Curated annotation (Swiss-Prot):
It comes from the Eukaryota. One of its GO terms (cellular component) is cytosol. The lineage of its organism: Eukaryota, Fungi, Fungi incertae sedis, Microsporidia, Unikaryonidae. Belongs to the URM1 family. It holds the Pfam family Urm1. The modification 1-thioglycine is found at residue 96. Acts as a sulfur carrier required for 2-thiolation of mcm(5)S(2)U at tRNA wobble positions of cytosolic tRNA(Lys), tRNA(Glu) and tRNA(Gln). Serves as sulfur donor in tRNA 2-thiolation reaction by being thiocarboxylated (-COSH) at its C-terminus by the MOCS3 homolog UBA4. The sulfur is then transferred to tRNA to form 2-thiolation of mcm(5)S(2)U. Prior mcm(5) tRNA modification by the elongator complex is required for 2-thiolation. Also acts as a ubiquitin-like protein (UBL) that is covalently conjugated via an isopeptide bond to lysine residues of target proteins such as AHP1. There is a cross-link at residue 96 (Glycyl lysine isopeptide (Gly-Lys) (interchain with K-? in acceptor proteins)). GO terms for biological process: protein urmylation; tRNA thio-modification; tRNA wobble uridine modification. Pathway: tRNA modification; 5-methoxycarbonylmethyl-2-thiouridine-tRNA biosynthesis. SUPFAM superfamilies: MoaD/ThiS (SSF54285). Its main location: cytoplasm. It comes from Encephalitozoon cuniculi (strain GB-M1) (Microsporidian parasite). C-terminal thiocarboxylation occurs in 2 steps, it is first acyl-adenylated (-COAMP) via the hesA/moeB/thiF part of UBA4, then thiocarboxylated (-COSH) via the rhodanese domain of UBA4. This is Ubiquitin-related modifier 1.
Length: 96
């Protein structure tokens, strides 16, 4: 499972990919994108400030794309995922 990040407030996270191994996905019982995001939040601290609020939820203004489909037209947090899937998080909130 690969995560890609765009528009992050953390410059080092911008355009970065994080890949979870099959063992991580299956061993952590990751079945939905919500599970995957919680795992990511817990393991990779640098994702927290740019994409998650203090409850571990995606911040307002973040677009989540699962295998080229907006999660808004899927099942959002309940969308099923598996090893090999691609998830893109895009922050649309920018200072100005």
């Amino acid at each position: 499972m690969k995560f890609r990040f765009n528009g992050a407030s953390n410059v080092e996270l911008n355009n970065r990919e994080i890949e979870l191994t099959r063992e991580e996905v299956e061993g952590s019982s990751i079945a939905t994108v919500g599970d995957a995001l919680r795992y990511l939040f817990g393991k990779y601290a640098e994702t927290r400030d740019s994409f998650f609020d203090h409850h571990g939820e995606l911040v307002h203004g973040t677009i989540c794309i699962i295998n080229k489909m907006d999660w808004e037209i899927l099942e959002k947090e309940r969308s099923p995922v598996k090893h090999g899937d691609h998830i893109v998080l895009i922050s649309t909130i920018h200072g100005g």
